[in-house]
From Swiss-Prot:
It is found in: Membrane. Induction: By infection with Pseudomonas syringae. It comes from Arabidopsis thaliana (Mouse-ear cress). GO terms for cellular component: membrane. Its EC number is 1.14.19.41. The lineage of its organism: Eukaryota, Viridiplantae, Streptophyta, Embryophyta, Tracheophyta. Its cofactor is heme. Signal peptide: none annotated. Heme binds at C434. Disruption phenotype: No visible phenotype under normal growth condition, but upon infection with P.syringae, no accumulation of stigmasterol and increased resistance to the pathogen. Belongs to the cytochrome P450 family. This is Cytochrome P450 710A1. It is an enzyme of class 1 (oxidoreductase). Pfam families: p450. Plants overexpressing CYP710A1 show higher levels of stigmasterol and lower levels of beta-sitosterol than the wild-type.
Amino acid sequence: MVFSVSIFASLAPYLISAFLLFLLVEQLSYLFKKRNIPGPFFVPPIIGNAVALVRDPTSFWDKQSSTANISGLSANYLIGKFIVYIRDTELSHQIFSNVRPDAFHLIGHPFGKKLFGDHNLIYMFGEDHKSVRRQLAPNFTPKALSTYSALQQLVILRHLRQWEGSTSGGSRPVSLRQLVRELNLETSQTVFVGPYLDKEAKNRFRTDYNLFNLGSMALPIDLPGFAFGEARRAVKRLGETLGICAGKSKARMAAGEEPACLIDFWMQAIVAENPQPPHSGDEEIGGLLFDFLFAAQDASTSSLLWAVTLLDSEPEVLNRVREEVAKIWSPESNALITVDQLAEMKYTRSVAREVIRYRPPATMVPHVAAIDFPLTETYTIPKGTIVFPSVFDSSFQGFTEPDRFDPDRFSETRQEDQVFKRNFLAFGWGPHQCVGQRYALNHLVLFIAMFSSLLDFKRLRSDGCDEIVYCPTISPKDGCTVFLSRRVAKYPNFS
């Protein structure tokens, strides 16, 4: 024992020197990669500014944005990873337009490959990526979207009734964040895999998705008992569950039955091919379905919450929505909103698009540099850098009075969605642009139309209630706390 202590004592100066040398090299490496772009001159050793990010994501990213105000980009350091934040729209386009093996790789999350696994749609390139996107085309035809619309309305109505019933006649406020999340999770389950999840599987699914949500916001410590590790294992279980649904759907479609949900439209096309296309095994389909779920679930939760928030603060907009919907659809008809009626709700659709512009759910789209990439004449992004193009910042560039919530910017007269198309990046750009954006927009339009027509609502305002928080997509700080009451004599009966 004395001998061991003696050896340690003799080695201690060398160990301390080696550790200090490591810290020095780490700082010098950061400064070398940072070069002349804005960013902290010193970063905490090893973990960088990860603690600041996890403790208060909003302040962290706001600071990155303000630091990049003049140059269009800024630097930082997170758990051994050099990062570059991109505020300027044209610089962001350089990232989105160069997603390929020898430039940038979309990762979806700073530690996405650990969390999602390697076999994921967002990591595909070239023919593999094109093949899978072609497979997805039948999922978003007019016939498919019409099927989803009916399912969406049934789920939305059921949840709106439950929300109103839980408020004691409108005398008690409710926070909508968790309620909207539950609505969207049931919508995703119903639309994506319909009849293939029984009650027990749905409950397991809900538990695993909540574990994933918590882990996606945690430090990437992949050990038992840590949220990130639990999230990674939950993703695997979710993919397996969805893979089982894919197998059941294949059997049903092979028997010639009619599609009833998204996986049916997908599998109907696959079983018709001989031989079956690449990446069409049950397990791979399950992983791809999880990609859809991840893309749809939290993004829609964010958009629905901001829709309620913004409609409450803009009574004129709310009145115009109600007037338009009332001319097209009546709850007393007990009829679902048809796709033709949905297409007629042009102002309501403009409101939905403005909600997405004004508060894009996923504010950044992380990529990793596969090479040293010359971004500007004076700065080259080093290989291995995690790059964060900010679609949030782009939404406030170019547009007329961008800080103002103004749905009319998307009218047929002004057409700012075309004039400033390069700034509207909420659905991405380039080869990995969101394949389900029509579905997502329809979901938001249906929710706005039904929520505003069936319910009266008023925010319980508090200090900072409209501030942005990340969970993991953005939402109002107060969770959108509202008083709810029914504004119709009776709810429609869609049965």
